[in-house]
């Protein structure tokens, strides 16, 4: 088994949130075995900017579920959705 790369869209709960701080909190929340390869930002609307981390996880049962759950628990996160998944 190899690894899987997933681009995950993380919507903050406010356009006023400090995205750098949110990015740090997302990195700290990662479950064991997962790592972030990079972040992109996507202007959504009305000043709201989504974070799009590319997360690397082992290819196994559950896939990105543990990462999604961890991100949902981070203060300031409104929603989490997997945008794209592929094997490395």
Swiss-Prot record:
Kindly give the InterPro entries that the UniProt entry links to this protein: eEF-1beta-like_sf (IPR036219), EF1B_bsu/dsu_GNE (IPR014038), Transl_elong_EF1B/ribsomal_bS6 (IPR014717), Transl_elong_EF1B_B_arc (IPR004542)
Q: Which HAMAP family match?
A: EF1_beta
The record's listing under CDD domains reads: EF1B
The job of this chain, per UniProt, is described as:
Promotes the exchange of GDP for GTP in EF-1-alpha/GDP, thus allowing the regeneration of EF-1-alpha/GTP that could then be used to form the ternary complex EF-1-alpha/GTP/AAtRNA.
A Pfam family (short name) is: EF1_GNE
- Write one Gene Ontology MF term: translation elongation factor activity
Record PANTHER family:
ELONGATION FACTOR 1-BETA
Alphabetized, the UniProt keywords read: Elongation factor, Protein biosynthesis
Q: What is this protein called?
A: Elongation factor 1-beta
Q: Which SMART domains match?
A: EF1_GNE (SM00888)
Q: Which organism is it from?
A: Halorubrum lacusprofundi (strain ATCC 49239 / DSM 5036 / JCM 8891 / ACAM 34)
Q: Which gene encodes it?
A: ef1b
The answer to whether keyword NADP applies is: no
- What family does the entry list? Belongs to the EF-1-beta/EF-1-delta family.
């Amino acid at each position: 088994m190899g690894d899987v790369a997933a681009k995950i869209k993380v919507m903050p709960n406010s356009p006023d949130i400090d995205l750098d701080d949110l990015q740090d909190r997302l990195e700290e929340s990662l479950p064991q075995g997962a790592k972030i390869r990079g972040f992109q930002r996507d202007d959504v609307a009305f000043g709201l900017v989504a974070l799009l981390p590319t997360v690397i996880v082992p290819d196994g049962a559950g896939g990105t579920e543990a990462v999604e759950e961890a991100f949902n628990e981070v203060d300031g996160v409104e929603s989490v959705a997997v945008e794209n998944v592929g094997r490395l």
